């Protein structure tokens, strides 16, 4: 059955909540809220107050994982400090899913490039997921949206390198580009399969 997709030219926190309700699907149990919490120095990410109405309504936990590259999000200590500077933990419960190991491994038996996806261990604590994406261009992924959130976003620090390297993490920045994109699709499919359809997606084109 084809998924229902709703569109709106009005981009406000209230409209996001309205569209979520229109989906007509209840996310049950412990809900993971996957979004991009913002790089250091980036002023265009969608701030906590923009997402607050829908997150408060759902009552979930904002989840992130550490990065595989240098910066302010590649260690748990630095990442938590940045989340605080950006105001996320002032509004919501926040969980760095790969703050402690070992990684959780999702099998991808029909994966084209990768057959395993290494994700944050705490993913096992959640029963459903709300994917809140700031849809925009991305220099490597082409687009930054729901697929990237489900793949790179849910992957652990090691898992990110594994996807970028198309199964060879040591080739994180040198793997064939098409193989990387296919690895993202493989990884995203494993997260969708894990939640058995208990996922809702909201994509917002704002601050492009």
Positions of the model-derived regions?
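Extended, low-polarity segments enriched in aliphatic/aromatic residues
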Residues: 2-53, 57, 61-208
